[in-house]
From Swiss-Prot:
Protein name according to UniProt: Solute carrier family 2, facilitated glucose transporter member 4
Further details from the record: Insulin-stimulated phosphorylation of TBC1D4 is required for GLUT4 translocation.
A GO MF term: D-glucose transmembrane transporter activity
Cytoplasmic compartment segments: 1-24, 103-111, 164-171, 222-287, 345-353, 406-417, 467-509
Residue ranges of the TM segments: 25-45, 82-102, 112-132, 143-163, 172-192, 201-221, 288-308, 324-344, 354-374, 385-405, 418-438, 446-466
Extracellular compartment segments: 46-81, 133-142, 193-200, 309-323, 375-384, 439-445
A GO cellular component annotation in the UniProt record: sarcolemma
Quaternary organization: Binds to DAXX. Interacts via its N-terminus with SRFBP1. Interacts with NDUFA9. Interacts with TRARG1; the interaction is required for proper SLC2A4 recycling after insulin stimulation.
NCBIfam families according to UniProt: SP
Keyword terms, alphabetized: Cell membrane, Cytoplasm, Glycoprotein, Lipoprotein, Membrane, Palmitate, Phosphoprotein, Sugar transport, Transmembrane, Transmembrane helix, Transport, Ubl conjugation
Catalytically driven reaction(s): D-glucose(out) = D-glucose(in)
Alphabetized PANTHER family for the sequence: SOLUTE CARRIER FAMILY 2 (PTHR23503), SOLUTE CARRIER FAMILY 2, FACILITATED GLUCOSE TRANSPORTER MEMBER 4 (PTHR23503:SF120)
Modified residues (Phosphoserine): 10, 274, 488
């Protein structure tokens, strides 16, 4: 266990770091169960594509009757399948607009709890679609599970970011992405023909997404609400004190409350902002642009094109068993996300994001070369595997985990919910565009499709290098000061601390 996970005693009057308590572990685990579902439903639609399309055709024939014109037209089937993939993102786009409203109205924990109703509804519709001979039910189920995931994509990083100690905020924030990629990997494994990816069992493959929802409904009531939300937003000192005691394991949290009172006093001049107020705010324009571009760098990097269509990409690259190669990419995905958990508090957010973008750009160029030379050099199929594995690995070093939690770091308590909504909508809009349009772009551009992503990745690298600040080890107030141009705060020595502990000046300064 890294040393950062241990409680560090006070030295020279410096407040101790918050140790990792059982309550903190339970709260983070319960929250990221939502991210696990998010990832599962990204990956689950890929492997069983052919058997689901066959089911669509059977439904079509059943509705036409024996005197009908025959099998479903290829163009109609392509459209139905693209809609089945992309409607997930439509649900996410719509629900992401509600992140700020719901998180302020219900609170972070209760919002995640009630969100599970969408997961249960979506999973039930998808699981019963074959029995009901209705591809509309499957598409509608994908919409509801997408709406669930859209809320999850904002609520989970917000909750984890607000309960996490500053010195672990990056590592715990990265667990959100680790849960997503673990969900993708589980979906890829269960989607094999030897598992649930068969003509008979694919409804079960899609329907079991209700299981983590039910588990989260059991665990979340045992977890504390965000003390920042309770005290700063709801002005509930008693419940906030109780929540702090459970999260920190400290009997005396008076200094923590003093810090929250000071932050609340400052934020009284910065009321919670609506979406329109945030978009019109000159003060928050720069961090908002950064938040949006970081979300674009995640989605327009091409990673979802790889996951949505990985099997067909490996087939076109000449790989004999593309489903297993896809699972290999999922394993790489998970391993390198785990690596980023340990790197993010050492190397920093900005450095890892730059490294990831540069590596992905190189792998995209390598993938283009491999696809161009495949017919003349059969060994290029192996190069394509290396390129995709490298592409996935570099994604999980930076562009995968960083954008999700850095948005919560760039904004103070007042504008944070609205900022999460804007960033989430940007992410889901790009997700939809890739899911709906990649196949058409790939057909038009052929082997050069990944060159397009390489150009975009280069642009995102330049933007990150020029505009994105480092947030590692800084409190929310210190990060906010970057955009308010307060040099005195920027020049402060970054000391180990937690967002839920005393932030006052060091006695020796």
């Amino acid at each position: 266990m890294p040393s950062g996970f241990q409680q560090i005693g006070s030295e020279d009057g410096e407040p101790p770091r918050q140790r990792v308590t059982g309550t903190l572990v339970l709260a983070v685990f319960s929250a990221v169960l939502g991210s696990l579902q998010f990832g599962y439903n990204i990956g689950v639609i890929n492997a069983p594509q052919k058997v689901i399309e066959q089911s669509y055709n059977e439904t079509w024939l059943g509705r036409q009757g024996p005197e009908g014109p025959g099998s479903i037209p290829p163009g109609t089937l392509t459209t139905l399948w693209a809609l089945s993939v992309a409607i997930f993102s439509v649900g996410g786009m719509i629900s992401s607009f509600l992140i700020g409203i719901i998180s302020q109205w219900l609170g972070r924990k209760r919002a995640m709890l009630f969100n599970n109703a969408l997961a249960v509804l979506g999973g039930t519709l998808m699981g019963l679609a074959k029995a009901a001979a209705s591809y509309e039910m499957l598409i509608l189920g994908r919409f509801f599970i997408g709406a669930y995931s859209g809320l999850t994509s904002g609520l989970v990083p917000m909750y984890v970011g607000e309960i996490a100690p500053t010195h672990l905020r990056g590592a715990l924030g990265t667990l959100n992405q680790l849960a997503i990629v673990t969900g993708i990997l589980i979906a890829q494994v269960l989607g094999l023909e030897s598992m649930l990816g068969t003509a008979t069992l694919w409804p079960l493959l899609l329907g079991i997404t209700v299981l983590p929802a039910l588990l989260q409904m059991v665990l979340l009531p045992l977890c504390p609400e965000s003390p920042r939300y309770l005290y700063i937003i709801r002005n509930l000192e008693g419940p906030a004190r109780k929540s702090l005691k459970r999260l920190t394991g400290w009997a005396d949290v008076s200094e923590v409350l003093a810090e929250l009172k000071e932050e609340k006093r400052k934020l009284e001049r910065e009321r919670p902002l609506s979406l329109l107020q945030l978009l019109g705010s000159h003060t928050h324009r720069q961090p908002l642009v950064i938040a949006i571009v970081l979300q674009l760098s995640q989605q327009l990097s091409g990673i979802n094109a790889v996951f949505y269509y990985s099997t067909s990409i490996f087939e076109s690259a000449g790989v004999e068993k593309p489903a297993y190669a896809t699972i290999g990419a999922g394993v790489v995905n998970t391993v390198f996300t785990l690596v980023s958990v340990f790197l993010v508090e050492r190397a920093g957010r900005r450095t890892l994001h730059l490294l990831g973008l540069a590596g992905m750009c190189g792998c995209a160029i390598l993938m283009t070369v491999a696809l161009l030379l495949l017919e003349r050099v059969p060994a290029m199929s192996y190069v394509s595997i290396v390129a995709i594995f490298g592409f996935v690995a570099f994604f999980e070093i930076g562009p995968g985990p960083i954008p999700w939690f850095i948005v919560a770091e760039l904004f103070s308590q007042g504008p944070r919910p609205a900022a999460m909504a804007v960033a989430g909508f940007s992410n889901w809009t790009c997700n939809f565009i890739i899911g709906m349009g990649f196949q058409y772009v790939a057909d038009a551009m052929g082997p050069y499709v990944f060159l397009l992503f390489a150009v975009l990745l280069l642009g995102f690298f330049i933007f990150t290098f020029l505009k994105v600040p480092e947030t590692r080890g800084r409190t929310f107030d210190q990060i906010s000061a970057v955009f308010h141009r307060t040099p005195s705060l920027l020049e402060q020595e970054v000391k180990p601390s937690t967002e839920l502990e005393y932030l006052g000046p060091d006695e020796h300064d």
